[in-house]
Each structure stands twice: as C-alpha cells, then as structure tokens.
C-alpha cells in the first residue's frame, strides 16, 4: 500500500526521483491523468486491472466512453531508470500544471503527483471538512 507525503523536484528533463519507500513496490509503471488536476502513477498490473474494469462496463454509455478516452489517451508506460527516476511527459506536466516543486503522495493502490502549491491548497480546503466527509463516505469504520 502506498502511503505518505513526499516532496520532490523535477529536473530539466521532467524527471523526479521516486521516493525510497515506493521503489520496491513498483517495476513497470503507468502515469496518467488523475482527478483534481493531479497525475496518477500505477504499477502496470494495477493499471491493467483498472482499465480492464472500465472497459468491461457498458461502452454504450457516453460517459464511460468519454472517461475511458481521457484516462487511456494520456497514459504513458515506462520503467524507472537505474536512479529510480520517472519521466513526466510534457502533456501530463501541462495537465497537472507541474512546476519544479512537486509532491508525491501515497493514495493506497496508486501514487498521486501534485504541483506542491496545488497540493497545499487542496489539503487546506479539504482538511476543514475531513471529519464531516468521514461520516458520509466511511460511516462507523473509524
């Protein structure tokens, strides 16, 4: 399970070093558009499981087709290099409006990559409603 918050920097080639805690958990990865203008980084097998699940839904529904197009068309598969660096394609960097300072967060079965300022703003907005949200999405679990 991917956990934690890790500040990293993008180099001049749009690469970042994968946090040490995540290195042994990933071999081949897929980077794609995420929600709230962040990027999602999946282990390739998890990405295939999710994309298979989406493809197995009713493709006759326009919303399913639209989501599938956006999710898959931006995806980029790769292997981290020997220095554990991941390259962010230009179109994905633009989508998430990533600058030099980025934040890598563990989000359970995937990793999210945020512009650091955007992550700070998002966290500030969401923390205020955190306990209220818990009662709605996970009633009685915590």
Swiss-Prot record:
<dbReference type="InterPro" id="IPR020603">
    <property type="entry name" value="MraZ_dom"/>
</dbReference>
<dbReference type="InterPro" id="IPR038619">
    <property type="entry name" value="MraZ_sf"/>
</dbReference>
<dbReference type="GO" id="GO:0005737">
    <property type="term" value="C:cytoplasm"/>
</dbReference>
<protein>
    <recommendedName>
        <fullName>Transcriptional regulator MraZ</fullName>
    </recommendedName>
</protein>
<dbReference type="GO" id="GO:0003700">
    <property type="term" value="F:DNA-binding transcription factor activity"/>
</dbReference>
<feature type="domain" description="SpoVT-AbrB 1">
    <location>
        <begin position="5"/>
        <end position="46"/>
    </location>
</feature>
<keyword id="KW-0963">Cytoplasm</keyword>
<comment type="similarity">
    <text>Belongs to the MraZ family.</text>
</comment>
<keyword id="KW-0238">DNA-binding</keyword>
<feature type="domain" description="SpoVT-AbrB 2">
    <location>
        <begin position="75"/>
        <end position="118"/>
    </location>
</feature>
<keyword id="KW-0805">Transcription regulation</keyword>
<dbReference type="InterPro" id="IPR035642">
    <property type="entry name" value="MraZ_N"/>
</dbReference>
<keyword id="KW-0677">Repeat</keyword>
<dbReference type="InterPro" id="IPR035644">
    <property type="entry name" value="MraZ_C"/>
</dbReference>
<dbReference type="InterPro" id="IPR003444">
    <property type="entry name" value="MraZ"/>
</dbReference>
<dbReference type="InterPro" id="IPR007159">
    <property type="entry name" value="SpoVT-AbrB_dom"/>
</dbReference>
<keyword id="KW-0804">Transcription</keyword>
<comment type="subunit">
    <text>Forms oligomers.</text>
</comment>
<dbReference type="GO" id="GO:0009295">
    <property type="term" value="C:nucleoid"/>
</dbReference>
<dbReference type="InterPro" id="IPR037914">
    <property type="entry name" value="SpoVT-AbrB_sf"/>
</dbReference>
<dbReference type="Pfam" id="PF02381">
    <property type="entry name" value="MraZ"/>
</dbReference>
<dbReference type="GO" id="GO:2000143">
    <property type="term" value="P:negative regulation of DNA-templated transcription initiation"/>
</dbReference>
<dbReference type="GO" id="GO:0000976">
    <property type="term" value="F:transcription cis-regulatory region binding"/>
</dbReference>
